Amino acid sequence: PALGFARRAKMIIDEYLAFLLTFVLVIPFERLWMPADRLSKGKQPILLVHGYGCSRGVWWLLRRRLEAAGHTVASVSLAPPHISLGRLEPILSQRIEAVCAATGSPQVTLIGHSMGGLIARCYLARHGNERVARLITLASPHMGSDMSRIGFGQNSREMTTGSLWLQDMAAEPLTVPTISLRNAYDNYVMPQDNQRLPGAQDIELP
C-alpha cells in the first residue's frame, strides 16, 4: 500500500538518523558498544552476520536483546569490506568453526542482514548444512538491488540486479530451514521484491 506524505517523510528521516548513528557513533567506536562475544557452553549459539560497509558493531542493540532473552550470541566482522562476496565467505566459515568450538555446539543459527544473508547462503552452498541449523535473512538483496550500482567494491557489483554471482547463487538449493524477513518500503534494496528468496518462508514486516 502507498504511504502518505507524513509517514514517508518520517520513514526517510528515521533511516537517515539510523545511518548517522551507525556510521558516526557505532562503527567508529565499536569496542565501546560491542565487547567480546560471551560464548558459554550448553546452548546453540546465534551468529550475527552484518551487511555491506558495516561491522559487528551494528548488532549492539539486538545482541543485548537476544542475550536478555537467554540466547548465546556471537558476531563476526567481514573485512576488508569491499572485496568479493566469495572472498568474504571464508571469514564467516572460520568464525562458525570458532564459535562451535567455544560453545561445544555442533551447529549455529545464522542471522544475516542485507549482504550478510548472501554471505550466509554462499557458506551453505560451499560447505553444506553440517554446521548450520537454520538461516534468517533481514532485508537481503537475494535477487540484487539497483542501488548497488552506486556502491563501491566488487561485492557491490556482485549485488547488482541480474549479476552472474547472484544467478549462480540462485541455482543453489536451500539446505536448511530459512526465513526471509523483508520490508515493502526498503530504500536500499530496489526493487523491494528482490528481497524475496524462493524456497524460504517469506515474511513482510510492516
At which residue positions do the language-model features occur?
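Flexible, membrane-associating and regulatory peripheral segments of lipid-active enzymes
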Residues: 1-46, 60
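Short intrinsically disordered, low-complexity coil segments enriched in acidic
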Residues: 2-4, 117, 206
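Short amphipathic alpha-helical patches
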Residues: 36, 40, 76, 89-90, ...
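C-terminal catalytic-base region of ester-bond hydrolases, centering on the histidine
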Residues: 173-206
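Feature targets compositionally biased, intrinsically disordered low-complexity regions
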Residues: 41, 103, 198-199
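Serine-dependent carboxylesterase/thioesterase catalytic core
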Residues: 48-52, 56-57, 61, 65-175, ...
